[in-house]
């Protein structure tokens, strides 16, 4: 049992799953884990893709690089993208040439091309410093992030965002961008 009551402990628990011999060993012969799987195809790893120390779920397509990460079902990671130390939940799309460091990305998120996440100083989140911390980028479900933006550490983003939401193309470390429920 592990307490995952914070984003930091949730991230740590997922990173422990990809240890050589994880504390919570998914491969124990005497303690099998049974799940009812969806009927989806196996994951696809392109010939020139790179994957190391990661869990890649069924239905996922990887054309870029994935390092030390946990990737959910049905995710698409496009060519040139580099994912490090991150958790990406099901049905999300990561754009071409994105660089994502230490992020938790929820379900059904679309990230445009040439996006960089996890840059800058490790300063506390201004809105909820006890929640959005640990140097993580946190992206809520059904969020859209436009192409060509940079996102700092200890940030939170939710909703359908546009380039205008990123002054100078940047969401600085410690900032929160909440567009949930907004309509045009």
Task: Locate predicted features.
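Left-handed beta-helix
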Residues: 1-184
